[in-house]
C-alpha cells in the first residue's frame, strides 16, 4: 500500500498563523469566508479557501451539502471540493495531509490560505494529528461486515465491549462503521483502540483541546438556538424546491452507491435515500433530516466549546458578525 508523502509539521513555519473559520452547520461560515476573500481582493491579496467539510469533497453532492455555487467557485479559489466520487472514502488523515500540503503551497505562491468548515474530526486531525492506527485490512473488514449483517450491530457492539469497553462506551450500538473499525483494530494489533489512542501524542505535543500556535481559530457560535433551527428548516425547504430530490435520484440510480458509504450517510442524503427506498414518507424524511441536522449542529458546538482559546462571535448579532470580519481583515495585515 503506497504511503502518503511526508508533509512538514506546520508549527515549524515562521509565519503568521493560518486563519481557520469554524462553526456549526448553518452559522454562516462560507459567507464570512467569501466576504473576507472579497476584501482581500480589494487590497491586492488573493485568498485561497480550503474546505474543511466532509460532504463537499464528493462530486454530485451539491444541493444537499450547500456546496458553493459555480459562480462562487469561479470568483474565488477553492480547494478540496469535488475531488472524489461518492463511491470513495475520504478520511480525516487524508484531509490533514491535503490541508497541510495546500497551506504550504498557497503560501509559496504568495497567497493567503484560509481553512473553513465544520467537520471537527478533520479539525482535530489537521490541528493535532491522529494516532498511528493501522491501515484498513479488507479481509478482516469484509468478514466483520458479514458478521454484523448476520447477528446485528448491537451484538457486534457487545463483542467490542468485552475487548475494548472504553471505546464501546462512547459508541452507539448501531454505529456500524465505528464499531467495525474498533473491532478491526483489535484484531490487527491485538490490543484495544482506546489504549492506542491514549498512547499517541499529538503532532506538537499539546492536548486536543488546545489550539496550535500556527492556527488562528475563529468560531461562529449562535447564541439563539431557536433562530439557528429556523434557519436550518428554511434552508432544507429551499433545498427541496431547488431539485435536491432530483440530485438524490441521480445518485440513487447508481447501483454502486449504498448507505454504508460515508457520502450517502451525509445528513439529508441518508434520509432522502430512505424515502426513495420506500422506507419513510416525505413528511418523515423532512422531519428526520431536520432532527439529524440539529443533532449535527449540537455535536459541533459541543466540540467547539471544548477548544480553549478560540475567538467566538455570534453570527446572528450584526455587531459581532462585523467584529468577526474586522478581526479576520486584521489577520491579513500581519
From Swiss-Prot:
Q: Where is this region: Interaction with substrate tRNA?
A: 53-56, 177-181
Q: Where is this site: Interaction with substrate tRNA?
A: 119, 141
A GO term for molecular function: ATP binding
Q: Which Gene3D superfamilies match?
A: 1.10.20.140, P-loop containing nucleotide triphosphate hydrolases (3.40.50.300)
What are the protein's UniProt keywords?
A: ATP-binding, Magnesium, Nucleotide-binding, Transferase, tRNA processing
Reaction catalyzed = adenosine(37) in tRNA + dimethylallyl diphosphate = N(6)-dimethylallyladenosine(37) in tRNA + diphosphate
Q: Which InterPro entries match?
A: AAA+_ATPase, Dimethylallyltransferase, IPT, P-loop_NTPase
Query: What's its job?
Result: Catalyzes the transfer of a dimethylallyl group onto the adenine at position 37 in tRNAs that read codons beginning with uridine, leading to the formation of N6-(dimethylallyl)adenosine (i(6)A).
Question: In which family does this protein belong, per the annotation?
Answer: Belongs to the IPP transferase family.
Would you tell me the protein name for this molecule? tRNA dimethylallyltransferase
Gene that this polypeptide is encoded by? miaA
